[in-house]
Regions:
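Conserved N-terminal phosphate-binding loop of PLP-dependent enzymes in the Aspartate aminotransferase
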Residues: 1-344
């Protein structure tokens, strides 16, 4: 076993990994990458088939992104966004607001997908309190949802393998049926058959379940503060696609019942579904758009939560009113990450 592998075994604790098994074998130690190819310290080549967990868009060692980071590094690597602005982050915010289309004109930067979702969750919660006077706003997300690993994001998740162990830390959220055409529960589709919608006329029973759940909550006088979803494709649940038309229908239902829309495009954003954002396929305009992963082309950790002027305005006020959004991170709006994102 080479020296680097020995150091890894001795000191490193890997994510989502049963370390008992990990320590039984020599790990693959990556030394460099080019395009879709990774090379380890022994010179062996590997295909980066999952794009380094859905982060890499243009290939490793892309000259344009390399140059952008190098140019920025000669100026400054990082300065705080707390009380200071910077050029790359300002330019990136403008680009994001432009390509997102619609009313998403305000950008809150953070570090990764979980923190982007966390910011949206806090903003939606406080916005709901201020506009409805409901003290404990409720949230709803889809069965099989995965939105990250911080406490708020885990509270919105519904995959027991990842989330059950932390039950005592979490706040309660509701879940609702997500569509699964391949194994549609309403027509007893057999696993070996094709998409259920191809051989039986669909009556959108899955949409009816969403409508029932959300409308019942509204009738209780405590409508959901927000409906949180992964648009078009649920990732960690098993790469489960949503049928055409489902997202548009449930978005209208949720909005009609007073819920804000939080679109988690951490995985689907930046062209993964054929359009820049998955919501664009169904003309869905969320109140919050959470992006990360591919934003830098897979280079550096930076994320963003896009929202509307209406949400932004709810946090404006005098200091004694305590309307400030008290949330942030040390590396919010980091110049190197923003420079990589602008190039990407």
């Amino acid at each position: 076993m080479n020296k680097l592998a020995q150091l890894d075994h001795k000191y490193v604790w890997h994510p989502f990994t049963q370390m008992r098994d990990w320590l039984k074998r020599e790990p693959i130690v990556i030394a460099e990458g080019k395009g879709a190819e990774l090379r380890d310290v022994r010179g062996r080549k590997f295909l980066d088939a999952n794009s380094s967990i859905w982060t890499n868009l243009h290939g490793h060692n892309h000259p344009k992104i390399n140059s952008a980071i190098q140019r920025q590094l000669k100026k400054i690597a990082h300065s705080s966004a707390l009380g200071l602005a910077n050029e790359p982050a300002s330019l990136l915010a403008e680009k994001l607001a432009t390509v997102a289309n619609g009313k998403l004109k305000k950008v809150f930067f953070s570090d990764d997908g979980s923190t982007a979702l966390e910011a949206a969750l806090k903003l939606a919660c406080e916005f709901s309190r201020r506009t409805t006077k409901i003290k404990n706003p409720k949230f709803i997300s889809l069965e099989g949802a995965y939105h990250g690993d911080t406490v708020g994001a885990v509270s919105l998740g519904h995959i027991d393998l990842f989330h059950k162990a932390y039950g005592g830390l979490l706040f309660k959220t509701d879940k609702v049926m997500s569509p699964y055409c391949y194994r549609c529960p309403f027509n007893r589709a057999k696993p070996e058959r094709d998409d259920a919608r191809n051989y039986r006329k669909c009556n959108w029973e899955c949409v009816g379940k969403v409508e029932q759940k959300i409308s019942v909550q509204k009738k209780k006088g405590n409508p959901y503060a927000a409906f949180v979803f992964e648009p078009l494709m649920q990732g960690a649940a098993g790469m489960i696609p949503q049928p055409k038309g489902w997202l548009n229908r449930v978005a209208k239902i949720a909005r009609g019942c007073g819920a804000l829309l939080i679109a988690d495009e951490v995985m689907t954003g930046f062209g993964r579904t054929g359009k820049l954002f998955a919501c664009h396929h169904e003309n869905v305009q969320p109140d919050f758009l959470c992006v990360a992963k591919g934003m830098t082309g897979g280079y550096l950790p930076i994320a963003a939560t896009l929202t509307t002027q209406k949400i932004f305005d709810a946090f404006l006020g005098e200091y004694h009113e305590f309307k400030t959004f008290f949330h942030g991170h040390s590396y919010t709006g980091n110049q190197l990450g923003a420079a990589a994102s602008n190039a990407s």
